[in-house]
Amino acid sequence: MERLQRLMMNSKVGSADTGRDDTKETVYISSIALLKMLKHGRAGVPMEVMGLMLGEFVDDYTVNVVDVFAMPQSGTGVSVEAVDDVFQAKMMDMLKQTGRDQMVVGWYHSHPGFGCWLSSVDVNTQKSFEQLNSRAVAVVVDPIQSVKGKVVIDAFRLIDTGALINNLEPRQTTSNTGLLNKANIQALIHGLNRHYYSLNIDYHKTAKETKMLMNLHKEQWQSGLKMYDYEEKEESNLAATKSMVKIAEQYSKRIEEEKELTEEELKTRYVGRQDPKKHLSETADETLENNIVSVLTAGVNSVAIK
């Protein structure tokens, strides 16, 4: 009976618009935090990894994540163990000594290769975080499906039990911000909008961080003076020559076929197929450029050594 009364009290609180979350609420993740999460997730493949997020709750619509740190735990393909409280306390003390005095705003973990959603173990872990802070966020990142220019990541929070009992909307809608992103079908199957809802994610980048990210994999001028092994270069040249001979045979065969085709058939004959002429030209140009650069590099290095 007491449990039912507590649930009813929670539902009354949740029915007021002032006490409900908003669909406009956005999690802002810094560049360094995102890079750390991706690097940690890729290092743990094929196992799951987890860590804690540091930041602040700016207002009712903004959660700012400025940094993350990894947690030592064992994981399986679908779950990770709970947080190590002793390690967390020691890590927070050491971070405060470096000037990182932000609070824990949630946790993150990886789903290598199978999308962003919360399993039953993840839901229980999130419950423990929300008992400490009702606005705690669970971020899931997929390091396998993430590619350059597109990070597969999502943020979640559990739906209030009282709202579920009274069939109330878990969040109030004051703008169209929360409706711009289409829900993932895989997450819907695993309980999205039934047990937990998705939060908007955005990224804070300063001018210096943008410059740093642009130069992350940028070629330096010194890379042009790097000497490659002559045997490997000879093997690559031989492979390129064999490839060009094969492409030339395909091109001559294509010319013979074109003689028997009409203009209408030629328009759709090679749609979606590789163009032997273009491929031959690109392969020849690439081989010539690589060999010219290799010869010039060898000459520069021989003069520099003298």
Swiss-Prot record:
Keywords: Acetylation, Hydrolase, Metal-binding, Metalloprotease, Protease, Proteasome, Thiol protease, Ubl conjugation pathway, Zinc. Its EC number is 3.4.19.12. Zn(2+) binds at residues 109, 111, 122. Signal peptide: none annotated. The keyword Zinc-finger does not apply. Residues 1-20 are annotated as: Disordered. N-acetylated by NAT3. One of its GO terms (molecular function) is proteasome binding. It catalyses: Thiol-dependent hydrolysis of ester, thioester, amide, peptide and isopeptide bonds formed by the C-terminal Gly of ubiquitin (a 76-residue protein attached to proteins as an intracellular targeting signal). The modification N-acetylmethionine is found at residue 1. GO terms for cellular component: cytosol; mitochondrion; nucleus; proteasome complex; proteasome regulatory particle, lid subcomplex; proteasome storage granule. It holds the Pfam family RPN11_C. A motif (JAMM motif) lies at residues 109-122. PROSITE patterns: MPN. GO terms for biological process: mitochondrial fission; peroxisome fission; proteasome assembly; proteasome storage granule assembly; proteasome-mediated ubiquitin-dependent protein catabolic process; protein deubiquitination. Residues 27-162 form the MPN domain. Component of the lid subcomplex of the 26S proteasome, a multiprotein complex involved in the ATP-dependent degradation of ubiquitinated proteins. RPN11 is the only catalytically active member of the lid and serves as the essential deubiquitinase of the proteasome. Belongs to the peptidase M67A family. Component of the lid subcomplex of the 19S proteasome regulatory particle complex (also named PA700 complex). The 26S proteasome consists of a 20S proteasome core and two 19S regulatory subunits. Interacts directly with RPN8 and STS1. The JAMM motif is required for the deubiquitination and degradation of ubiquitinated substrates. Present with 16400 molecules/cell in log phase SD medium. This is Ubiquitin carboxyl-terminal hydrolase RPN11. The lineage of its organism: Eukaryota, Fungi, Dikarya, Ascomycota, Saccharomycotina.
